[in-house]
Amino acid sequence: MKVIVVKNQLEGGKIGLDLLKKSMANGAKTLGLATGSTPVEFYNQIVNSDLDFTDMVSVNLDEYVGLDGSNDQSYRYFMTKHLFGEKPFKENFLPNGKAADLEAEAKHYDQIIEENPIDWQILGIGQNGHIGFNEPGTPAEITTHVVDLQESTIKANARFFESEADVPRKAISMGLASIMKSKNIVLMAYGKEKAEAIKGMVEGEVTTELPASILQNHANVTVIADEAAVSLLSK
């Protein structure tokens, strides 16, 4: 696991863009994408670049249950706003949070990932160590699944909604086993509130209680983080 320390999200976004360019030059065709505040500057860098994605496929990590793509808090809306609206792809896949049969939708999404193996996956990390919506206690072998969001995640995401009561309680998320199949993983983290999770992920034992720690078992992980996020690392 390689750790790159940056001054801020702007520098992190630029480094992320450079890593993506190298991966695309080496033939990457499928990108795994994340949402939330962490990758926004990275997406800004992509939008302002000359990269062409018209022959590329994207596969997103997750989506809230109950929100359709027109809802401004859905992850499809987020991706359209920050990336897809400016940089067209050959195809964009996200879980359908409005599916009548959520378990069937999870199986369908696994099939999409099987048909579009992820070459380059971007991740954020939650304060509790979640990646995607894989909360503490999630089995390592799980693929796409329906998740009951933990209270800490609901509280962390409440700032995006009118009130905490409006935050969806469930999501469909790519599983840890799905994420681990990605050829290359780049995880971004900014701010002191991520320091405990980063320490556990990089230096702690691999445990389901800190889902991101499973990344220690992946051969190609790069962490892009600011000084605050790496402040608890011993090396």
Swiss-Prot record:
Q: Does the keyword Plastid apply?
A: no
Q: What class of enzyme is it?
A: hydrolase
Question: Its GO CC terms?
Answer: cytoplasm
Coiled coil regions in record: none
Q: Name one Pfam family in it.
A: Glucosamine_iso
Spell out the molecular function terms from Gene Ontology.
glucosamine-6-phosphate deaminase activity; identical protein binding
Q: Which reaction does it catalyse?
A: alpha-D-glucosamine 6-phosphate + H2O = beta-D-fructose 6-phosphate + NH4(+)
Could you tell me the Gene Ontology terms of the biological process aspect for this record? Answer: carbohydrate metabolic process; glucosamine catabolic process; N-acetylglucosamine catabolic process; N-acetylneuraminate catabolic process
Q: Which UniProt keywords apply?
A: Carbohydrate metabolism, Hydrolase
Q: What does this protein do?
A: Catalyzes the reversible isomerization-deamination of glucosamine 6-phosphate (GlcN6P) to form fructose 6-phosphate (Fru6P) and ammonium ion.
PANTHER family per UniProt: GLUCOSAMINE-6-PHOSPHATE ISOMERASE (PTHR11280:SF5)
What is the official name of this protein in its record?
Glucosamine-6-phosphate deaminase
Organism whose genome encodes this protein: Lactococcus lactis subsp. lactis (strain IL1403) (Streptococcus lactis)
**Its encoding gene is what?**
nagB
